[in-house]
Amino acid sequence: MTFSVQETLFSLLRLNGISGHENSIANVMQHAFEQQAKDVWRDRLGNVVARYGSDKPDALRLMIFAHMDEVGFMVRKIEPSGFLRFERVGGPAQITMPGSIVTLAGRSGDIMGCIGIKAYHFAKGDERTQPPALDKLWIDIGAKDKADAERMGIQVGTPVTLYNPPHCLGNDLVCSKALDDRLGCTALLGVAEALASTPLDIAVFLVASVQEEFNIRGIIPVLRRVRPDLAIGIDITPSCDTPDLQDYSDVRVNHGVGITCLNYHGRGTLAGLITPPRLLRMLETTAHENNIPVQREVAPGVITETGYIQVELDGIPCASLSIPCRYTHSPAEVASLRDLADCIRLLTALANMSPEQFPIEPETGATQEARP
């Protein structure tokens, strides 16, 4: 079977799954893994795991992971008028909320709605230029009152996702909601396809994880079961090629997958990843040998599961591959199919390496700067 990056990505983007409600994506991931993998399971939290490669008990264990959930909302209250108050799940960009189309997972099926906005003709002062506070926003599903909304299948706790089906833009770019992190899920399926008939010297565990956007720790039960020697995460990173971010960094779409040197989130979570230099060298050398374009990134304000995985068990060496993405956590994220394909190529090359090529143990001499 020929793997199509675009078709696979678009099929995943058409699914909805905020944190804690990833089943539709998990079902697709599990079914795809079961076509080739030696062993596939879904744990009690909903993480989907597939094992490829060596069955030897002492084989080096490489875990590659990406999260299935997307940012969104949850219904908090149904007003007597039938309008819905809601809370954020994860960090959807609040500035984009008013006027957005949303999908609600009703008891009997999906329901369309929109986030209301004060009529521009009657808006005054800051109301015309500043987004309202979250507690001033509401969702309109066309219900005439609370009882009508309940008859339509809405209740407190109903999941809500942003609505924007995938579209193709120019130069291999795509626009959609939930590119964070269906890009990573697509990469997992691309690697799975590549490894299906390939003998490996190591054991590779592909993990589609849950609740990254909510608590960043949904994957923890998996790593305690798998006990990997090395973990590599796949996620998005802000692309800084737009007019508002050009002075921030050189990370750009269509210039290869990002290799994270540092990410850090200090607003409450206080965690992040400083990638060990030996792993940076491994990633850059492998990319160079396979003619795969990569770009380094330092990303304060960004955090992934690696921030917590690295301090589990006896300490797990971690690295992160980041696919540049414009307009993150908005209904219209933009990323490159070319960068996604490069990510799949790099991960596949890593999975095909011999155990001796993985620098698991820390260096004992002076730290050397990573270089290809």
From Swiss-Prot:
GO biological process, any: proteolysis
Cofactor mode of binding and number, as noted: Binds 2 divalent metal cations per subunit.
Catalytic residues of the enzyme: 212
Keywords: Aminopeptidase, Hydrolase, Metal-binding, Metalloprotease, Protease
Family matches, as InterPro entries: Peptidase_M42, Peptidase_M42_aminopept, Peptidase_M42_dom2
EC number(s) on file: 3.4.11.-
Pfam families referenced in this protein's UniProt entry, alphabetically: Peptidase_M42
Binding residue positions for a divalent metal cation 1: 67, 180, 235
Cofactor: a divalent metal cation
Disulfide bridge positions per record: none
Binding, a divalent metal cation 2: 180, 213, 329
GO-annotated molecular function: metal ion binding; metalloaminopeptidase activity
Keyword Metal-binding among record annotations: yes
Family label: Belongs to the peptidase M42 family.
The name this protein goes by in its record: Putative aminopeptidase SgcX
Organism in which the protein naturally occurs: Salmonella typhimurium (strain LT2 / SGSC1412 / ATCC 700720)
